[in-house]
């Protein structure tokens, strides 16, 4: 009975995903763009490569002048602005977070293999 339920659930999920796809009706016309939308003019007149090569040193010089410390200090993200002690004090005082930190697994003892009888152990749990 549960297998039938899961099969129905999988089928319903696949039909919902198919239902979200757009339906294409051929009578409404084609989905292609018109020729005027694809007209970019004479591409040879753009001459992008020479314009890019001509302006590339200007872009590189501007980026080289900007130092990482300048970027962080302008936006208020200085390296000295982050103080870990303040964050820890704030989080330790909150009752929910301090309760969760006590329940975390980092305080649990690590598993140690016994050198004695292996029949007392199953996988990593020893009796």
From Swiss-Prot:
Keywords on record: Cleavage on pair of basic residues, Disulfide bond, Hormone, Secreted, Signal
One protein family per Pfam: Urotensin_II
Disulfide linkage: 121-126
GO MF assignments: hormone activity
Signal peptide: 1-16
Domain of life: Eukaryota
Record propeptide residues: 17-111
GO biological process, one term: blood vessel diameter maintenance
Cellular compartment(s): Secreted
Distribution of this protein across tissues and organs: Central nervous system. Spinal cord.
PROSITE patterns the record matches: UROTENSIN_II (PS00984)
Any one cellular-component term (Gene Ontology): extracellular region
Function comment: Involved in smooth muscle stimulating and ion mobilizing activities. It has a suggested role as a corticotropin-releasing factor.
Family: Belongs to the urotensin-2 family.
Name the UniProt record assigns to this protein: Urotensin-2
Organism encoding this protein: Pelophylax ridibundus
Lineage: Eukaryota, Metazoa, Chordata, Craniata, Vertebrata
